Swiss-Prot record:
InterPro entries: Metal_resp_DNA-bind_regulator, Tscrpt_reg_PadR_N, WH-like_DNA-bd_sf, WH_DNA-bd_sf. It comes from the Bacteria. Keywords: Cadmium, DNA-binding, Metal-binding, Transcription, Transcription regulation. Homodimer. It comes from Mycobacterium tuberculosis (strain ATCC 25618 / H37Rv). SUPFAM superfamilies: Winged helix' DNA-binding domain (SSF46785). This is Transcriptional regulator Rv3488. Cd(2+) binds at residues 16, 30, 34, 101. May have transcription regulation and metal-detoxifying functions through which it may enhance intracellular survival of mycobacteria. Binds to its own promoter region and to the Rv1999c promoter region. It displays strong affinity for cadmium ions, but can also bind zinc, manganese and nickel. Expression increases the intracellular survival of recombinant M.smegmatis in murine macrophage cell line and increases its tolerance to cadmium ions. GO terms for molecular function: DNA binding; metal ion binding. Contains an N-terminal winged-helix-turn-helix (wHTH) DNA-binding domain and a C-terminal alpha helix, which is mainly involved in dimerization. Binding of cadmium causes subtle conformational changes in all key metal-binding residues and conserved DNA-binding residues. Disulfide bonds: none annotated. Transmembrane segments: none annotated.
Length: 107
């Protein structure tokens, strides 16, 4: 997966985990709806890394009659999401805003 797509997947995960508890199967479906093909071999290491970084917490729960690990954003995860949103807004303004930038002019 390319770096920009990894960052987008991270942003999606934090976005959804900030509002609700999420689990891997649901995230796979949700990401697929947005055009991302994320295998379990990519998704679960990403979830584990976000948890190790203190951005998510998880616990085992019964969901739809099955034992599943559910994830939710921590306060640090919500703060990271806010920072990511700001960075994305700035990038979108620069790249999609229609502004002309000349190399070397400092803008």
């Amino acid at each position: 997966m390319r770096e920009f797509q990894r960052a987008a997947v991270r942003l999606h995960i934090l976005h959804h985990a900030a509002d609700n508890e999420v689990h891997g199967a649901w995230l796979t479906q949700e990401l697929s709806r947005h055009g991302y093909r994320v295998s379990p071999g990519t998704l679960y290491p990403t979830l584990h890394r976000l948890e190790a970084d203190g951005l998510l917490v998880s616990e085992q729960r019964v969901v739809d009659g099955r034992a599943r690990r559910v994830y939710r954003a921590t306060p640090a995860g919500r703060a990271a999401l806010t920072e990511d949103r700001r960075a994305l807004e700035e990038l979108a303004r620069e790249v999609l805003g229609g502004q002309s930038h000349t190399a070397g002019n400092g803008t």
